[in-house]
């Protein structure tokens, strides 16, 4: 794992993080292995600085931050997002921003609305490609419908790119993030929908995807065997 305090030169700063096969490369072109913690900003906004400082103190190089688009949770403004990402940069952590409002929802229009939100606040993303990653929506698609998951993301990813958002994108698996097979079956199509070829995938390991060693290995290996970049975005029970 490479620390994030190396200052990229001007040229590589413009490209930021980049997916390369099964690996994520940082702005210096080094493989970046995430070690991080989730922070529920939307529900504990007054504790952001305290929480982020405590997370950094663990040695984490990444923090995944719960944000709100206004559909269900309080809407984060550009200023709110900037404050979060600036603090992460100060603490030498990569910020992963995700919208939590569509968690477990199966309606494609809600994913489109999440994409609309990111386009609205794109000023908080553009120019920060070397320390901000975009996790479009937390656990969109609650059922095990890989085709719907694929159709939704192949629709919104090009829209985000057309809006000028160049940050690395993370897409959570279907089935509340636990249906890794959706990535195995359709991940290549979702990746191909990104004109920047800079999309990676995440599976959330709870009682289904993380129930035992064999299941954990299968949920990761079947996708990486197809050349896709995978992370575990959440885990617990």
Region roles according to the model:
Residues 34, 64-68, 96-100, 135-137, ...:
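Short beta-strands and strand-loop turn motifs
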Residues 12-26, 46-51, 81-88, 92-94, ...:
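Short, charge-rich amphipathic segments
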Residues 68-72, 101-109, 137-143, 204-207:
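The substrate-binding groove and active-site-proximal loops of carbohydrate-active enzymes
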Residues 42-44, 68-72, 176:
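Short active-site-proximal "capping" loops at secondary-structure junctions
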Residues 16, 45, 115-119, 123-133, ...:
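Extracellular glycoside hydrolase catalytic/binding regions
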Residues 3-62:
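N-terminal carbohydrate-binding accessory modules
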